Amino acid sequence: MGQKTNPIGNRLGIIRTWESRWFAKKGYADQLIEDLKLRKMLKDKLYHAGISKIEIERVGEKVRVLIFAARPGIIIGKKGAEVERLKKEVEEKTGKQANIEIKEVRRPELDAQLVAENVALQIEKRVAYRRAMKRAVASSMRFGAKGIKVSCAGRLAGAEIARTEWYREGRVPLSTFRADIDYGFAEAKTTYGIIGVKVWIFKGEVQPGQYINYNY
């Protein structure tokens, strides 16, 4: 089971918490779709800032958006001008009072989503996929990861038949629920088609009853 499912979803309520935190008696589907659209809009607009994840909290007529980014300066802009612009866009989209907070990802080499996007970007720039994978693995292990697995799937190197190749170093215990495993997915759009990149990073074990608190 651990091999097939999303490691983040698999650990919800055990050592991880939800990225959308709100309750709704009615209009649940509308708010869920609004969250998805909001995440897509912010991700597309702030792609160059290296967005790791976006958390959304709703209380009454207020929306709180937490953006975890590798380069927060790009989002903030001069004297916070960009944040104000984003705030207005979020308020227009949701029709509620918005509060935007930016948090820095201090070690992007240990963030699975950012590592996956970096590998995908290298593949798009025609770097050999094996070299991109090995470089990402070496970098994460150097920064203190207990284990990492990187997988690339698609028409690798322009092959006629699509295949999957992966590279792993260290331990990645996907079936151990107390294991803090971060997961990220990105797509590389090449002339041959789309190549999917998946990354699993094992950072250690969490004691029962404790939740992961990343030092962002």
From Swiss-Prot:
Task: State the PROSITE patterns in the record.
Answer: KH_TYPE_2, RIBOSOMAL_S3
* Keyword Amino-acid biosynthesis set for record: no
Return the InterPro entries for the record. Answer: KH_dom, KH_dom-like_a/b, KH_dom_type_2, KH_sf_prok-type, Ribosomal_S3_C_sf, Ribosomal_uS3_bac-typ, Ribosomal_uS3_C, Ribosomal_uS3_CS
Residues in KH type-2 domain copies: 38-106
Question: Which Pfam family would be a valid example here?
Answer: KH_2
BP terms from Gene Ontology? translation
Gene Ontology CC annotation, any one: cytosolic small ribosomal subunit
Q: Which GO terms describe its molecular function?
A: mRNA binding; rRNA binding; structural constituent of ribosome
Superkingdom as given in the UniProt entry: Bacteria
| Record keywords | Ribonucleoprotein, Ribosomal protein, RNA-binding, rRNA-binding
Family of this protein: Belongs to the universal ribosomal protein uS3 family.
NCBIfam families in alphabetical order: rpsC_bact
Assembly and oligomerization: Part of the 30S ribosomal subunit. Forms a tight complex with proteins S10 and S14.
Task of the protein: Binds the lower part of the 30S subunit head. Binds mRNA in the 70S ribosome, positioning it for translation.
The protein, known as: Small ribosomal subunit protein uS3
Species, as recorded: Thermodesulfovibrio yellowstonii (strain ATCC 51303 / DSM 11347 / YP87)
